[in-house]
Amino acid sequence: MQLEPIDMRFGVVRKEDYSISVRKCHKKVLSTRQFSRRAKASVAFIVKRPGCIICKEEGLMLRELVQSFPENRVAAWAVVKEIDVDNDGLTALYQNYFRFPFFLDRKMKLYKAMGKNVINRFKFFYNIRKNGARKRIADKGIEGTFIGKGEGLILGGVLIFDAKGDICYAYQEKSGAEELPIEEFRCALNAIIADQESN
């Protein structure tokens, strides 16, 4: 399973000319100057559609979660399905909500490994109303629309890795409109960190 690094540091989406495995993506993120090998775990944000406000909310929530751990104990990175479809949405997600490394999964192998669940459009719009997603997101100051550009039917999720690169926790979106279970993620990260520090 190969992913391609994406460089967005200067407001331009540029794919690198090489690909690396998921485990190497995790290791590459941990070795960056930002984390300086202090991270005991990493959070991989598997993005449904970068331009949609649900993904912006998820990026913001995951960024706040990662930053709540002291001394860069937790690293973060993201995976997208495509580029050059909504580069404005992708750049906005990176610059305003989730400023961590991004990787391209052109063949969607990571999405397939997570079950490749497809959104039920009726359920999605029903859950937006039922869960109060519109108000919840507006209260966080996030602007945009629920419909973005590009492929948005295959749901995303979150993977949590330990320092060795083993997946210790996986979460897949159910309807695409629910709020992330951040406290579950926090418990999983605390358990991973405690386990690694006790060894």
Language-model-detected regions and their locations in the chain:
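A short beta-strand-turn-helix
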Residues: 8-42
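Cofactor-binding loop segments of dinucleotide-utilizing enzymes, especially the Rossmann-like FAD-
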Residues: 48, 81, 163
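Structural microenvironment flanking redox-active thiols in thiol-disulfide oxidoreductases
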Residues: 58-113, 119
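Thiol/selenol-based redox catalytic cores and closely related redox-interacting motifs
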Residues: 105-177
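A short, polar/charged loop-to-alpha-helix boundary motif
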Residues: 176-192
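Cysteine/selenocysteine-centered motifs that mediate thiol-based redox chemistry or coordinate metal-sulfur cofactors
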Residues: 195-199
